[in-house]
Amino acid sequence: MNKKKVALLFGGRSSEHEISVISARSIANALDKTKYKIQPIYITKAGKWLGAEASRKILAMDFESAIKSPTKKEIHLIEKEIVLLCQNSQFRFDFRTAKIDVAFPVLHGPYGEDGTVQGLLEMFDVAYVGSGVLASAITMDKAVAKICFEHAGLQVGEYLAFLRREFEENRGSVVARAEKKLRYPMFVKPANMGSSVGISKAHNRNELIEAIELALAYDRKFLIEKAINAREMEVAVLGNDEPIASAVGEVVPCNEFYDYDAKYVKGSSEVIIPAQISEAFAGKLKAAALNAFVAADCEGMARVDFLVEKETNEIYINEINSIPGFTSISMYPKLFAQVGISYTELINRLIELALERYSERKLRKI
């Protein structure tokens, strides 16, 4: 049996770099070795692509323990090792001559989850796992995604979106508009980041200004959202034109909200799968997740995050992650495991979906 060659793209020019490496390592370990052969391709924080030998060495590094270190000493040691590998590694790679059957981008955040790598793979004429250029770009930009969700009839929380220029030219006006429409407490987010990077909760004007300045360190666009007293629910979606939804999960954060530290560093947030809700209410969340998936033109996979108001049970869609995490604690594989789809089977299906979509595209007249 000829094994299909899978190019595993990981790392990348994003603040979610380490999470990408951890996700890729989990996928590499779970991949069905009887069907697939891995070609790892590591992308440095500077954007340099490394060959298979260096990439395998990086894939074996213990990033998971390193990011939990309070001193960050371990992560600095890993970064030094990577610098040495970069000095001795030359990347000369042609997807066609390498006979890559499918690429699996495990790149979280900008320059990987936003349509950039997807466009590159389209130009190379390579099948790849996950959403295409349009859906990746839509779901990466939280402001654009909210417009898409509202058009599809989904409820989003009250928010305002601003550009850096607006804040720099008249910060007083930005703050006044937020205070008038949203009132405290509020959340401030970069428009184009994931893993809750750059997100802050503001309880007063000084905190709001600080939160905006933090968000602008990551993006030229930011959102200010009205805080909702809510439970955090998540639904995973799998498929192309006929997607299916997973069980519903709930996250109970160890911090005031589910930020980067609560997700990956402290690791003490509680995950409840399935969520303790009625079957009828779970059905509403699943239907909303599928609606959002289709509205954004997603393919392959996505994790849809919701806020459920504690007193009224009103459902608000928060965001879609087109390349959800695949770490040992990530919700996406756990949610499908609850409905009988193992981690390895999930990866098999994602690769099959990518190849199906590629075959369908080759039939088009272009």
Swiss-Prot record:
Describe the location of the ATP-grasp domain by residue ranges: 146-352
Where is it localised? Cytoplasm
What is the top EC class of this enzyme, as a single word? ligase
What cofactors does this protein use?
Answer: Mg(2+); Mn(2+)
Its UniProt entry gives the catalysed reaction(s) as: 2 D-alanine + ATP = D-alanyl-D-alanine + ADP + phosphate + H(+)
Keywords of the record: ATP-binding, Cell shape, Cell wall biogenesis/degradation, Cytoplasm, Ligase, Magnesium, Manganese, Metal-binding, Nucleotide-binding, Peptidoglycan synthesis
Please name the Gene3D superfamilies in this protein's record: 3.40.50.20, ATP-grasp fold, A domain, ATP-grasp fold, B domain
Keyword Disulfide bond in record? no
In terms of NCBIfam families, this protein maps to:
D_ala_D_alaTIGR (TIGR01205), PRK01372.1 (NF002378), PRK01966.1-4 (NF002528)
UniProt name for this protein: D-alanine--D-alanine ligase
Q: Which organism is it from?
A: Chloroherpeton thalassium (strain ATCC 35110 / GB-78)
